[in-house]
Amino acid sequence: MANLSYWLLALFVATWTDVGLCKKRPKPGGWNTGGSRYPGQGSPGGNRYPPQGGGTWGQPHGGGWGQPHGGGWGQPHGGGWGQPHGGGWGQGGGTHNQWNKPSKPKTNMKHVAGAAAAGAVVGGLGGYMLGSAMSRPMLHFGNDWEDRYYRENMNRYPNQVYYRPVDQYNNQNNFVHDCVNITIKQHTVTTTTKGENFTETDVKMMERVVEQMCVTQYQKESQAYYDGRRSSAVLFSSPPVILLISFLIFLIVG
């Protein structure tokens, strides 16, 4: 982590230095660079520009023959035929009042970001996510008949659970309770629409199976959540990152 921070700092300083050098480089062209002269001064070929206006001979203000202000034939102010002030047909002054030209649709970045973030969330379930597939646990229910029934029907029970992020719950029990309820409800509704019904024994066994999987899901998500927080704390407490942040603040304030 420290090596990565040093590399990030070095890359930022190098980029900032290059940008600073680019800003100091003189731009090509400009006045008196050898390619043009002030009006009235001799050009390299010995000719002189007209004494005023910058147009060609007989052009008082830079237009063509008979162009008082830089337009075409019969153009008082630089527009086209029938254009009083530089617009097109029916255009009084430029880009306004164009012929019902539709504006280009603008992309809503919030919609784009929302669509990208919705990949991990199950649509229509109010923010619930679907966990990865798990192996169904081997459970014992206290008698041989139920144990045999479970082994024969375990493939009909869920092997994935629905859950919310762990930071929305105060403890494991609340997470597991919510996880079990939504998972069984969704699995029951989905299976019933396919023409298959569950008995009371099925529901009892599903509750045991899903509870075990929800506990496993909570442990996995909780570990990932705390690992992420710890990594962020270590990153922002490293000396190179602190130095980089201080340098950025100095540039912004200065």
Swiss-Prot record:
PROSITE patterns: PRION_1 (PS00291), PRION_2 (PS00706). Cu(2+) 2 binds at H69, G70, G71. Its main location: membrane. GO terms for molecular function: amyloid-beta binding; aspartic-type endopeptidase inhibitor activity; copper ion binding; cupric ion binding; cuprous ion binding; glycosaminoglycan binding; identical protein binding; microtubule binding. It is found in: Cell membrane; Golgi apparatus. GO terms for biological process: cellular response to amyloid-beta; cellular response to copper ion; cellular response to xenobiotic stimulus; intracellular signal transduction; learning or memory; negative regulation of activated T cell proliferation; negative regulation of amyloid-beta formation; negative regulation of apoptotic process. Residues 23-231 are annotated as: Interaction with GRB2, ERI3 and SYN1. Cu(2+) 4 binds at H85, G86, G87. InterPro entries: Prion, Prion/Doppel_b-ribbon_dom_sf, Prion/Doppel_prot_b-ribbon_dom, Prion_copper_b_octapeptide, Prion_N. Monomer and homodimer. Has a tendency to aggregate into amyloid fibrils containing a cross-beta spine, formed by a steric zipper of superposed beta-strands. Soluble oligomers may represent an intermediate stage on the path to fibril formation. Copper binding may promote oligomerization. Interacts with GRB2, APP, ERI3/PRNPIP and SYN1. Mislocalized cytosolically exposed PrP interacts with MGRN1; this interaction alters MGRN1 subcellular location and causes lysosomal enlargement. Interacts with KIAA1191. Its primary physiological function is unclear. Has cytoprotective activity against internal or environmental stresses. May play a role in neuronal development and synaptic plasticity. May be required for neuronal myelin sheath maintenance. May play a role in iron uptake and iron homeostasis. Soluble oligomers are toxic to cultured neuroblastoma cells and induce apoptosis (in vitro). Association with GPC1 (via its heparan sulfate chains) targets PRNP to lipid rafts. Also provides Cu(2+) or Zn(2+) for the ascorbate-mediated GPC1 deaminase degradation of its heparan sulfate side chains. Belongs to the prion family. The normal, monomeric form has a mainly alpha-helical structure. The disease-associated, protease-resistant form forms amyloid fibrils containing a cross-beta spine, formed by a steric zipper of superposed beta-strands. Disease mutations may favor intermolecular contacts via short beta strands, and may thereby trigger oligomerization. It is linked to PrP is found in high quantity in the brain of humans and animals infected with the degenerative neurological diseases kuru, Creutzfeldt-Jakob disease (CJD), Gerstmann-Straussler syndrome (GSS), scrapie, bovine spongiform encephalopathy (BSE), transmissible mink encephalopathy (TME), etc. This is Major prion protein. It comes from Cricetulus griseus. The lineage of its organism: Eukaryota, Metazoa, Chordata, Craniata, Vertebrata. The gene is PRNP.
